[in-house]
Design a protein with these regions (language model features):
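Glycine-rich, low-complexity segments
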Residues: 2-38, 177
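Terminal beta-strand-rich extracellular "head" domains
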Residues: 30-31, 36-39, 43, 55-143, ...
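Extended, low-complexity regulatory regions
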Residues: 49-51
Length: 177
């Protein structure tokens, strides 16, 4: 019996096909349990969740996936938890919140990625959020560190972003362009 081998492409050991695009190159993951923490700041603060990756290609795309928790001090608060991702010292939030905007304009001057409501009357309950963002502009093969930043939108609110035992995580995936 004669054998026949037919393939559309051969993927090298580096994980990316020659002239291929969209292939997963690598994944990095971090998860943390922080002690109890909160803020009243209306300026973005680094909340301690970060992950680093060294892209193999300067043209690749980095998909950032985040899962986190938040809640406010009081059930009657009507504030927003505002979140964004920094790549090293660059805020990747452009203020275009799409359907997550707080008004009908779909834009914001807040340089953020996500706004999460206090959800009055359950603002003091533990609220979880997750979101994904694709960084298409890193243009680097040096190590990149992505960090989650959060803040209150209004003064007078106390935003809790960590509690003992709660797991938060960030995943970075590099895809070939």
């Amino acid at each position: 019996m004669a054998s026949e081998l037919r393939v559309d492409k051969i993927i090298p050991t580096s994980g990316v096909a020659t002239n291929g695009s969209g292939g997963l190159v690598q994944t990095k993951f971090t998860q943390i349990r922080l002690s109890s923490a909160s803020t009243t700041s209306q300026s973005f603060i680094d909340i301690g969740l970060h992950c680093s990756i060294t892209p193999k290609f300067s043209t690749s795309k980095i998909m950032i996936s985040v899962s986190h928790y938040y809640w406010f001090q009081s059930n009657s608060e009507s504030d927003y938890c505002v979140a964004t991702i920094y790549r090293d010292s660059t805020n990747l939030g452009d203020g275009n919140l799409g359907s997550n905007a707080t008004s009908g304009t779909n834009t914001s001057s807040q340089n953020s990625m996500q706004w999460y409501p206090a959800a009055n009357p359950i603002a003091a309950y533990n609220n979880g959020f997750s979101f994904e963002f694709v960084d298409q502009t890193h243009n680097s093969t040096s190590e990149l560190t992505y960090k989650l930043y959060m803040r209150c939108n209004a003064s007078g609110s106390q935003l809790h972003y960590s509690w003992v035992g709660q797991m938060k995580h960030m995943r970075l995936q590099e895809f070939s362009a």
